From Swiss-Prot:
Listed Pfam families: tRNA_Me_trans, tRNA_Me_trans_C, tRNA_Me_trans_M
Site feature: Interaction with tRNA: H135, Q342
Annotated stretches, region: Interaction with tRNA: 152-154, 310-311
Family per record: Belongs to the MnmA/TRMU family.
Annotated protein name in UniProt: tRNA-specific 2-thiouridylase MnmA
Organism: Mesomycoplasma hyopneumoniae (strain J / ATCC 25934 / NCTC 10110) (Mycoplasma hyopneumoniae)
Length: 372
């Protein structure tokens, strides 16, 4: 049997993962990661509940993880990757927001922390054969597949992992649904069986987003402009606080119909909006993605490809039009609110074959220049 280090987060998914591996006869070691220090990282604005908020919620997770490890009778250790997370995840997040993009921190968090530094630690310190995580996804010989639970499938967040990382990773929940995981945890009497799923920024948690960003990026107000009429409709507090397709939070009142964010001009600090009746401004039919991660050698010969542009979106049919160096172009039927900075993940059936960061959007052959 293999020696496997499980990333035990304090949540139910990783707890059941550890149980299943031990039940299968493996030598299981639990390790809790702490990757964020609110005091050290100047994280004071944006607390979800000003009265009851604990400045370091991961401490409760650590306590839960210790109890679970005791219940499962497996050893547990704790490791900090606070500097690595700041340097290799959070700094990139801030830079992208300053550039007018909408990044997804979970992508880099998985690539650089959970499946890089954690894997290195597990191999060097514990001589692990594999690491395991509580993700709803599947691996097989370095290939990545969607999890059986379509509502919880997390393969989208894993699209930037290398084949070598995937070859050393096990996802025990890949063939299970969340309801089955909860049932197992309840039957075992695990203390976190009913614990709610984690939300918010990877390893940071829930925050009032606008306030949280102001810890690191000063507000830069500007005009809100109707993209069709060019009329100034109001003022915004900063482009970085808004994303394409957003319809609330920019303070427009007294309008005949709802308005959506459709783009921006970063240099002029302009936030472009459009009424609901003019949704064409949200549409694109092709894109260019950079930072390509090729997870299949045969993708050029595959038909019936589909793509996701955000988590929990139903995959839509696409065609790969061009590949050049580390970038690729795809086309699709007109689709709304695809957002630069987010990840596009391409599937053949349920296998992830290619992923990249959305860089440019096009409609009818023309670049959408109101996203600059």
């Amino acid at each position: 049997m293999a020696k496997i280090v499980v990333g035990l987060s304090g949540g139910v998914d990783s707890a059941v993962s550890a149980y299943l591996l031990k039940k299968a006869g493996h030598n299981v070691i639990a390790v809790f990661m702490r990757n964020w220090d609110s005091s050290l990282n100047n994280d004071f604005l944006g607390k979800k509940n000003e009265k009851n908020f604990t400045i370091c919620p991961q401490e409760q997770d650590w306590l839960d993880a210790k109890v679970v490890a005791k219940q499962l009778n497996i050893p547990i250790f704790r490791i900090d990757f606070i500097k690595e997370y700041w340097d290799e995840v959070f700094s990139d997040l801030i830079l992208k927001y300053q550039s007018g993009l909408t990044p997804n921190p979970d992508i880099l968090c998985n690539k650089n922390i959970k499946f890089k530094h954690f894997l290195d630690y597990a191999q060097k310190v514990h001589n692990a054969d594999f690491i395991a995580m509580g993700h709803y996804a599947k691996t097989d010989n370095g290939n990545l597949y969607a999890g059986a639970d379509s509502l919880k499938d997390q393969s989208y967040f894993l699209g930037q992992l290398s084949k070598s990382q995937l070859q050393k990773t096990i996802f025990p929940l890949g063939n299970l649904h969340k309801s089955e995981v909860r049932k197992i945890a309840n039957e075992l009497g695990l203390i976190n069986a009913k614990k709610k799923d984690s939300t918010g920024i990877c390893f940071i948690g829930e925050r009032k987003f606008t306030d949280f960003l102001q810890n690191y990026i000063p507000a830069q107000p500007g005009n809100i402009i109707d993209i069709s009429t060019k009329k100034v409709l109001g003022k915004h507090i900063g482009i970085m606080y808004f994303t394409i397709g957003q319809r609330k939070g920019f303070g427009l009142s007294g309008m005949k119909e709802p308005y959506f964010v459709v783009g921006h001009n970063l240099k002029e600090k302009i936030l472009y909006v459009s009424p609901q009746s003019e949704k064409k401004w949200l549409e694109s039919d092709s894109l260019m993605a950079k930072n390509a991660n090729f997870l299949s050698e045969n993708f050029r010969n595959l038909d019936n490809l589909s793509a996701k542009f955000r988590y929990r979106q139903e995959a839509i049919p696409i065609k790969i039009e061009k590949i050049q160096d580390n970038s690729f172009w795809i086309s699709y039927q007109k689709y709304q609110a695809i957002t630069p900075g987010q990840q596009v993940v391409i599937y053949h059936q349920n296998q992830v074959i290619l992923a990249g960061e959305i860089a440019l959007l096009f409609r009818n052959g023309k670049k959408l220049d109101y996203l600059d």
